[in-house]
Amino acid sequence: LTCSAMDARLAGLPFPAMSIVGSGSHGILCSMPVVSYGRFAGKTEEEIIRGVALSCLITIFSKHYTGRLSASAAVFWAGRGAAAGIVLLMGGSAKEASAAMDHMAANLTGMICDGGSIGCALKHPQVYAAYLSAMLAMEGIAFRIISA
């Protein structure tokens, strides 16, 4: 669902997309995976809204520190938010959400933005990594990111 929405957006089809941090790509990528998981898991509308809200807040917070333009692909920033939102829907804690975001950062570091084009849409199957990161975190699998 997320990849189809991104493909349609980047192909220029006339469908609306929620924008966040000045980008429709970020809006789609931080909301659709959480909504999809929430519906799949049978969560209530309120639970899904809370998951999307957390995802959006984390995406905004993360993107704030990169400036308006960044060489990192949208899925890098919005995927971290989506992972945390999915963890919330799974009943996870802040510790597990943090671990899921670390997994996403490690998984997608180096994915470079090449502009909003069809080539950009090829990167967005990586939103599945948000789900996998949430699953790893919920199983207690985490690692520390060590700064140099």
What are these regions (language model features)?
Residues 1, 88-148:
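Functionally critical mobile loop/hinge segments
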Residues 18-25, 67-78:
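Active-site nucleophile and cofactor-binding loops and adjacent substrate-binding regions
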Residues 67-69, 77-96:
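C-terminal structural cap/anchor segments
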Residues 26, 31, 42-61:
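A glycine-rich phosphate/pyrophosphate-binding beta-strand-loop-alpha-helix module
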Residues 53-67, 74-77:
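Glycine-rich phosphate/ribose-binding loops and adjacent secondary-structure elements
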Residues 1-6, 51-55, 59, 101-104:
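Short alpha-helical scaffolding segments that buttress acidic/His motifs in well-ordered protein cores
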Residues 27-43, 83-91:
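Alpha-helical support elements that line or immediately flank enzyme active sites
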Residues 1-25:
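Accessory "access/gating" subregions that flank catalytic or transport cores
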